[in-house]
Amino acid sequence: MNRITAYIRQSLQDIYPPEEVKALSMLICCDMLGVDALDIYMGKDIILSACKQRELENIIFRLQKNEPIQYIRGYAEFCGRNFRVAPGVLIPRPETAELVDLIVKENPDARRLLDIGTGSGCIAISLDKNLPDAKVDAWDISEEALAIARKNNEELDAQVTFRRQDVFSADGIQGTSYDIIVSNPPYVTETEKTEMEANVLDWEPELALFVPDEDPLRFYRRIAELGRELLRPGGKLYFEINQAYGQDMIRMIEMNQYRDVRVIKDIFGKDRILTANR
């Protein structure tokens, strides 16, 4: 172990699990400081310039404050692409990539798609890149999120149309006929806050995370209602869901006159995706 990795591990060992510290050490050295991975593996001692030393100290300081490494780097990997992220948007999760993969697999001929609550734009842009003949629209209520999404759209050479839209307002919502509506809306209840890590609670946007305990399905219910207006006959809904509400979601979606409702487990064996046909 060289002095740099030893310094990183010593600085973070009381905050992060050993395996995460090891992964962070490699990420910081190779990706953020430009150190050759082979030199790390061989234990070669590395001398950083004064500028790189200050950069390292800043990274460590921010990690000690529980800031997610993705925000420190300024981007996160999702579906094989790097997306800009900042505290105004959620950090993309692997479970959400499963949602994108499922949509692409099941709907290769889809032509019109809508992503509601787009955040960084990771779902919408990934669908646009993987379904090149499709036209993708994306909504969010947050101007901060939309600014980041539009930047990702430009940098990744995608053609998504982004718009500020409050789903609980009828203003601006017209009867466009979509093949697919997808959403990963807020679904963490206030009670579940106690189970969350500090790097999520302290840094990621509450607007994109939490729903009231007394109405955890409020966003899904409203989007299902919109789907009756905006989906063509035979169009599909795709949701990322809270694992605790799979059966409640099925009942609510069926009450909204959708058919072929399915709940699909994620890579961790938890109910995570719901699909339904109009």
From Swiss-Prot:
GO molecular function: nucleic acid binding; protein-(glutamine-N5) methyltransferase activity; protein-glutamine N-methyltransferase activity
Binding site for substrate: N184, P185, P186, Y187
Entry protein name: Release factor glutamine methyltransferase
InterPro entries: DNA_methylase_N6_adenine_CS (IPR002052), HemK-like (IPR004556), N5-glutamine_MTase (IPR050320), PrmC_N (IPR040758), RF_methyltr_PrmC (IPR019874), SAM-dependent_MTases_sf (IPR029063), Small_mtfrase_dom (IPR007848)
Pfam family, any one: PrmC_N
Catalytic activity: L-glutaminyl-[peptide chain release factor] + S-adenosyl-L-methionine = N(5)-methyl-L-glutaminyl-[peptide chain release factor] + S-adenosyl-L-homocysteine + H(+)
CDD domains: AdoMet_MTases
Family: Belongs to the protein N5-glutamine methyltransferase family. PrmC subfamily.
Enzyme Commission number(s) from the entry: 2.1.1.297
Entry function: Methylates the class 1 translation termination release factors RF1/PrfA and RF2/PrfB on the glutamine residue of the universally conserved GGQ motif.
NCBIfam families assigned to the protein according to its UniProt record, in alphabetical order: hemK_fam (TIGR00536), RF_mod_PrmC (TIGR03534)
Keywords: Methyltransferase, S-adenosyl-L-methionine, Transferase
Binding-site residues, S-adenosyl-L-methionine: G117, T118, G119, S120, G121, D140, N184
Organism expressing this protein natively: Bacteroides thetaiotaomicron (strain ATCC 29148 / DSM 2079 / JCM 5827 / CCUG 10774 / NCTC 10582 / VPI-5482 / E50)
GO biological process terms on file: methylation; translational termination
Presence of the UniProt keyword Methyltransferase in the record: yes
